[in-house]
């Protein structure tokens, strides 16, 4: 059987009531002018800066880099570049060529004719003169002249620029990610 519960008045000063701390009250008689520990901690955090300047700069930098890499990715996915290049494929049974806007490099034309002449490779015992001679004119154009005196002009735009541009676009996303991780690690140390 439980002992009877003694009810104390709010102004009681007995030994049981005087030992209680005012912050442990859970009833409505608590004094609201004294802030609780939780309220004091929350107010202290609200007055301080929530984000450091380094964190904000890092987030802005990463956002700009991700946006830039996303734009480059979308641009590289477009099919506009395929029409700029010339595709040539030849084996012993078929020839496939798709002409683009840019002209063929004279070295590529020489390689094609060499393959047509020697499909299994160049045999050193057979020596022939070159069928095509490459000459540079003053107008910065390349002239290919053949044995039958046909002349074909090829503009001086190097084909390597398209290859370098494609490689640069492929490696750009990896470079952006690597630089972002490096800058993030450097800012995290500070």
UniProtKB/Swiss-Prot annotation:
Residues 1-52, 188-190 are cytoplasmic. It is found in: Host cell junction, Host plasmodesma; Host endoplasmic reticulum membrane; Host cytoplasm, Host cytoskeleton. Keywords: Host cell junction, Host cytoplasm, Host cytoskeleton, Host endoplasmic reticulum, Host membrane, Membrane, Phosphoprotein, Transmembrane, Transmembrane helix, Transport, Viral movement protein. The keyword Transport applies. Changing residue 120 to A: Complete loss of infectivity but no effect on the interaction between TGBp3 and TGBp2. It is a multi-pass membrane protein. A motif (Involved in plasmodesmata targeting and virus cell-to-cell movement) lies at residues 89-93. The modification Phosphotyrosine is found at residues 89, 120. One of its GO terms (cellular component) is membrane. It holds the Pfam family Viral_Beta_CD. Residues 74-166 are lumenal. Interacts with movement protein TGB2. TGB1-TGB3-TGB2 complex formation is enhanced by ATP hydrolysis. Belongs to the virgaviridae TGB3 movement protein family. This is Movement protein TGB3. The lineage of its organism: Viruses, Riboviria, Orthornavirae, Kitrinoviricota, Alsuviricetes.
């Amino acid at each position: 059987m439980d002992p009877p519960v003694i009810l104390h008045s709010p102004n009681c000063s007995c030994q049981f009531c005087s030992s209680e701390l005012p912050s442990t009250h859970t009833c409505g008689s608590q004094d609201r002018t004294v802030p609780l520990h939780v309220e004091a901690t929350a107010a202290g955090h609200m007055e301080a800066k929530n984000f450091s300047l380094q964190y904000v700069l890092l987030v802005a930098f990463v956002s700009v880099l991700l946006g830039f890499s996303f734009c480059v990715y979308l641009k590289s996915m477009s099919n506009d570049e395929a029409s700029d290049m010339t595709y040539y494929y030849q084996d012993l049974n078929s020839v496939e060529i798709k002409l683009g806007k840019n002209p063929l490099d004279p070295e590529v034309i020489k390689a094609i004719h060499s393959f047509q002449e020697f499909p299994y490779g160049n045999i050193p015992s057979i020596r022939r003169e070159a069928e095509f001679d490459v000459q540079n004119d003053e107008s910065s154009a390349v002239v290919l002249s053949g044995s039958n005196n046909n002349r074909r002009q090829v503009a001086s735009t190097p084909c390597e620029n398209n290859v370098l541009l494609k490689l640069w676009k492929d490696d750009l996303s990896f470079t952006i990610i690597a630089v972002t991780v490096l800058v993030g690690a450097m800012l995290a140390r500070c």
